[in-house]
Amino acid sequence: MNKKSIRDVDLKGKRVFCRVDFNVPMKEGKITDETRIRAALPTIQYLVEQGAKVILASHLGRPKGQVVEEMRLTPVAARLGELLGKDVKKADEAFGPAVQEMVAAMNEGDVLVLENVRFYAGEEKNDAELAKEFAALADIFVNDAFGAAHRAHASTAGIADYLPAVSGLLMEKELEVLGKALSNPERPFTAIIGGAKVKDKIGVIRHLLDKVDNLIIGGGLAYTFVKALGHEIGLSLCEDDKIELAKEFMQLAKEKGVNFYMPVDVVITEEFSETATTKIVGIDSIPSNWEGVDIGPKTREIYADVIKNSKLVVWNGPMGVFEMTPFAEGTKAVGQALADAEGTYSVIGGGDSAAAVEKFGMADKMSHISTGGGASLEFMEGKELPGVVCLNDK
């Protein structure tokens, strides 16, 4: 990685404004999944050990520029203190005289959590005045929020105009793993693209067709490709305005020598529920009033075989409606194939794929689970991420 990280700068006694991603799911004031807090711990611990004064900034939810009581970061700061085994202070604002006083009172190794940065309208507008206020608190800016790296906001990008800017350890790892996958992958390199909509994955499919040996398609977006082959798809999801594009992608794969895999059989249903009756049919036999909700058993076997024989697999998007038990088997099978594959480096591209491997208890069998859904998708589209571009080069 050609960006400076916290390993490249002197931190002792320095005030560090560290942007983390503490956007954790909450229910009635309780954190229901603390993965993101845990993901930031190595960076925070490193800063503490190096004798920095650690000022942590994050967003939580979408308060849209105003104070929303249940989106305060107070429970997060409390949990962070427990995980670090030390006293963590919490500010009621994210900048201003009261916060400056708290920062002035900090000793080396102290940790302070600022209030939700999205309580301020200027955050999402990347307002220069707000960025200056953030910068006034610190000597160095550290961006460790890969999950928000695709946003040009005041605390993820704007602040870098006024302070030296480096990556945290989590950001560094994300950029290394995803960067290597795209620039110098081990082969055979397989991408598995699922999810509901073709339109969300156009950029990533187009970019990956230049890089991969195998492209596997699943999820709701597969039915647009099935229809592009001339098959009836019943009530399955379809984007009619993307059928020509699907044809173009299949043609491109052929021209570039990419093995293009799509379902040969699917699980279909007449009702969308936990107790739904399902049938398994060939891809050319979906009845008119049924809809496809998962990949079938033959498809699972084919996909598992491709995975097993790959050196690198990048997975973005589930194979079916995995949140419902009757439609979860395809996604589970892909996860299992990745878990069982020996000598295969597996990169899970955040979002729903990450949620699926967590749900099925396979997370610890994956080589790398990205902490950024949207960010990893944009990175895999070959886009520059504002939260990365703003960091100082080595």
From Swiss-Prot:
Q: Is Phosphoprotein one of the keywords?
A: yes
Give the record's keywords alphabetically.
ATP-binding, Cytoplasm, Glycolysis, Kinase, Nucleotide-binding, Phosphoprotein, Transferase
Principal location listed in the UniProt entry: cytoplasm
Source organism, top-level taxon:
Bacteria
Biological processes per GO annotation: gluconeogenesis; glycolytic process
Q: Could you tell me which InterPro entries the record lists for this protein?
A: Phosphoglycerate_kinase, Phosphoglycerate_kinase_CS, Phosphoglycerate_kinase_N, Phosphoglycerate_kinase_sf
Q: Which SUPFAM superfamilies match?
A: Phosphoglycerate kinase
Listed binding positions for substrate are: D21, F22, N23, R36, H59, L60, G61, R62, R118, R151
Q: Which reaction does it catalyse?
A: (2R)-3-phosphoglycerate + ATP = (2R)-3-phospho-glyceroyl phosphate + ADP
* Enzyme Commission number(s) from the entry: 2.7.2.3
The subcellular localization recorded is: Cytoplasm
Pathway(s) the chain acts in: Carbohydrate degradation; glycolysis; pyruvate from D-glyceraldehyde 3-phosphate: step 2/5
Record text on subunit structure and interactions:
Monomer.
* Family listed: Belongs to the phosphoglycerate kinase family.
Query: What is the protein named?
Result: Phosphoglycerate kinase
Species, as recorded: Bacillus cereus (strain ZK / E33L)
